[in-house]
Amino acid sequence: MECDLMETDILESLEDLGYKGPLLEDGALSQAVSAGASSPEFTKLCAWLVSELRVLCKLEENVQATNSPSEAEEFQLEVSGLLGEMNCPYLSLTSGDVTKRLLIQKNCLLLLTYLISELEAARMLCVNAPPKKAQEGGGSEVFQELEGICIALGMSKPPANITMFQFFSGIEKKLKETLAKVPPNHVGKPLLKKPMGPAHWEKIEAINQAIANEYEVRRKLLIKRLDVTVQSFGWSDRAKSQTEKLAKVYQPKRSVLSPKSTISVAHLLAARQDLSKILRTSSGSIGEKTACAINKVLMGRVPDRGGRPNEIEPPPPEMPPWQKRQDGPQQQTGGRGGGRGGYEHSSYGGRGGHEQGGGRGGRGGYDHGGRGGGRGNKHQGGWTDGGSGGGGGYQDGGYRDSGFQPGGYHGGHSSGGYQGGGYGGFQTSSSYTGSGYQGGGYQQDNRYQDGGHHGDRGGGRGGRGGRGGRGGRAGQGGGWGGRGSQNYHQGGQFEQHFQHGGYQYNHSGFGQGRHYTS
């Protein structure tokens, strides 16, 4: 399957390259690559591709087509040398036994693919980068320089068969004749007198190139400043009507300015000693000779535009400075905690904690007489055989109007947590008769719980405050009001979550049968 795809691509590429051979016929290419180097048609195709490459690339190696299978080894040797010169990246074509590489069908297809791709790339490069045309005036740069010397010295055109030694000897002779006609100090002595070798000239050329690059940057800066300045002249309303005149005058002068430096090593050889003289432009003798009217013009006072680095204010920071996070207002976590979850003397309902006098404590806060589920006087047991407070489900002892009833709303107005019969729970000794933050202390008036000392093994924390009795760990909320520490609300999760919600829920749902707490 892979070989079939490669054959299809090769046939399409050969048509694009202008191949007109017999291998374009159906099945001919497949038969040729199967025989490999033993097939004369295969070798002719390879030879055609290489000949096309040699037209565009400078290749020393060449490949000749074969006439019989006996010439296969010689053909493979020629292909191996060609691939080595072209730095072929395919190891299957450059490694292994040379006489057996092109006897494999896949390797033959790979060779054709490589030669075709190289030929396509060479043709594209030739189209995109045409050969440079000869400069106007004919000849190379060196020829033009020599021609300029001959013209400057008044020499006639040298014959075509002259050698370089004869040509330069003629130039030297003509120079001596010309110098003899001028005063002795007309040209001056050269500034560079020491003989230079090839290594010295290379260093001088490198130095000149570095300086040329530096001055090219400076020239570009000055030219850009010139362009911007001239452009600003045309911003005024008066100058907008003169734009064409300004361009007509400026553009010819601007086109002459080139950022490239024209200084070369030849200028160093032509330099004379007069260039080494340093003249002080401020000296009196020089000033007298160069004086003009502009020197007498004094510049008036101009405003200080600043720009000194030591006077510039630092920029604002990218990021604002880090500040310590301010704590929010402290919330009243316990506060009034007014629940009935403590030691209750009356029968105001809400069986949280250990009720002593609330035998028939009523169904919730407002019901004095109802059974409300639970035996009011059971100490240390808290088991409720009244189901969910006698009322079941949303009974008054569980759900119990707990918006503001004693035993419903936590924190500010509620009694203890899930108390108040909380689902049939006659909590005799709830370790934490109240939500996570409500008070469970000793309650005298059935309305306000102080968070102090619980009278009878109940208590828990009163509003994050006082330690409530021995009833288990202070932080463990009074779930089913067991024996203090054994409850199902570790840390009062539900109490904290619903302490401002208006309703109190039992952990186990809405009133489930009997609840036993040891």
From Swiss-Prot:
Residue ranges with Polar residues bias: 505-518
Biased segments, Low complexity type: 488-504
GO biological process terms on file: lysosome localization; positive regulation of cell population proliferation; positive regulation of gene expression; positive regulation of ruffle assembly; protein methylation
Coiled-coil segments on the chain, per record: none
TM spans (from-to): none
Molecular function GO labels: protein methyltransferase activity
Alphabetized Pfam families for the sequence: DUF2465
Residue ranges with Basic and acidic residues bias: 302-311, 447-459
Compositional bias per record (Gly residues), positions renumbered to this chain: 349-364, 383-396, 405-415, 460-484
Assigned GO CC terms: tRNA-splicing ligase complex
Family recorded in the similarity comment: Belongs to the FAM98 family.
PANTHER family on file: FAM98, PROTEIN FAM98A
Function: Positively stimulates PRMT1-induced protein arginine methylation. Involved in skeletal homeostasis. Positively regulates lysosome peripheral distribution and ruffled border formation in osteoclasts.
Protein known as: Protein FAM98A
Origin species: Pongo abelii (Sumatran orangutan)
Chain's gene name: FAM98A
